[in-house]
């Protein structure tokens, strides 16, 4: 009987947690809105270009509060918000405006798995619009400015030995009242201008790493000589002695390997590589590892492709865009990346992929991403599906307040 009661209580708790969230307002919903699970929001690893096996997703229900700018952390919060959907969106469960005179506060707790003991813990944000201050256990550990770029913070020194830790994020976003890049966001949307996107709008996650660990991977293909040049960046206390190894795999088989000091350019030669093109979006897997004193301390998965994009004048002097040394007429839609229910954030990864697949099915080979930078998984799907991307810089204020006002 006791086991039955415990099982019922556990079930009731789960149901209650799920029942707390629901889309707010009466905005149009996509078909994927009903597939959003508050206990498992966007569960896919968010950084396909540098993927670690061990990680913890912090998406889900957080507490939120909207307060006048400059006030201290609230002692009580307004309710729950479903991260990573912006507070103005329906899928956040809130659908409230913040404005340039207020700040948006987030709060949640998290635990660090016992298996991560002895590791450094990185707290990663896919994107927060616009200025974010991050607190762990009531200590301001870092800030980031920029609504479209990811950032990571090493939170290890601020974990206090307790099993549960407090995470607070404070966000200020003036939208069109500021000078920052913001794309189509305005306080009073109309016509071609859309709703502001304030706060966390991409996945938040934790991952354990060694004190020396991989931080970046840059791969540049040369199809004319069959060489992939790879530069691996690392956080290291002994950069000269830390060695990276890169393996290039074709359908699971290693076809090239190179080793070197982190930060140096490694060249991997492949005979007759298969070239990437829209009709055959061929990708090579990469395994990248970092070793210290001969011991492997970090390993990530990545991918790349052999392709060349160039421009050349034809016999009539007209500049032609080329792919893999052949003329390619690129044609595709202007894609603004807005969702009626999630604003900047797609309801699910399936939804994110759908638009790309449908665009390809309509006969296009290119998407112009208009004044928005998408999550990394969007570009990954384009690579896999054979879609070229023209990337816009998100537009900002015409006043250029960051630039000098006098010129010689």
Regions found by a protein language model. Name each.
Residues 1-21:
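Bacterial Sec-dependent N-terminal signal peptides
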């Amino acid at each position: 009987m006791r086991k039955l009661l415990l099982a019922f209580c556990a079930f009731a708790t789960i149901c209650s947690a799920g029942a707390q969230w629901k889309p707010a307002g009466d905005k149009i919903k996509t078909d994927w809105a009903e597939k959003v699970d508050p206990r498992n929001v966007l569960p896919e690893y968010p950084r396909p270009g540098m993927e670690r096996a061990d990680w913890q997703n912090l998406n889900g229900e957080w507490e939120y509060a909207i307060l006048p700018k400059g006030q201290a952390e609230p002692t009580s919060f307004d309710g729950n918000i479903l991260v990573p959907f912006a507070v103005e969106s329906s899928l956040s469960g809130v659908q409230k405006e913040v404005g340039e005179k207020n700040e948006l506060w987030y709060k949640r707790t998290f635990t660090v798995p016992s298996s991560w003991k002895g590791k450094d813990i990185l707290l990663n944000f896919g994107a927060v619009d616009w200025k974010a201050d991050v607190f762990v256990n009531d200590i301001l550990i870092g800030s980031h400015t920029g609504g479209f770029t990811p950032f990571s913070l090493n939170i290890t020194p601020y974990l206090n030995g307790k099993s549960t830790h407090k995470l607070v994020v404070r966000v200020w976003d003036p939208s069109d009242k500021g000078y920052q890049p913001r794309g189509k966001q305005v306080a009073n949307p109309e016509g071609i201008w859309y709703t502001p996107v304030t706060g966390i709008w991409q996945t938040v996650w934790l991952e354990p790493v060694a004190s020396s660990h991989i931080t970046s991977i840059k791969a540049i293909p040369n199809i004319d000589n069959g060489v992939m040049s790879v530069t691996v960046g690392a956080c290291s206390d002994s950069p000269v002695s830390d060695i990276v190894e890169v393996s290039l795999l074709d359908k699971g088989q290693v076809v090239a390997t190179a080793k070197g000091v982190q930060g140096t350019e490694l060249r991997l030669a492949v005979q007759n590589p298969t070239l990437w093109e829209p009709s055959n979006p061929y990708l090579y897997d990469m395994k990248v590892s970092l070793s210290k004193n001969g011991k492997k301390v970090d390993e990530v998965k990545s991918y790349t492709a052999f392709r060349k994009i160039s421009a050349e004048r034809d016999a009539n002097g007209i500049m032609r865009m080329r792919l893999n040394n052949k003329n390619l007429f690129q044609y595709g839609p202007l894609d603004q990346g807005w969702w009626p229910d999630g604003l900047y954030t797609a309801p699910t990864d399936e939804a994110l992929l759908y638009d790309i697949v449908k665009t390809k099915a309509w006969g296009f080979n290119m998407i112009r991403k208009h004044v928005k930078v998408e999550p990394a998984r969007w570009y990954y799907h384009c690579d896999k599906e054979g879609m070229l991307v023209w990337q816009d810089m998100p537009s900002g204020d015409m006043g250029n307040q960051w630039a000098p006002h006098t010129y010689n």
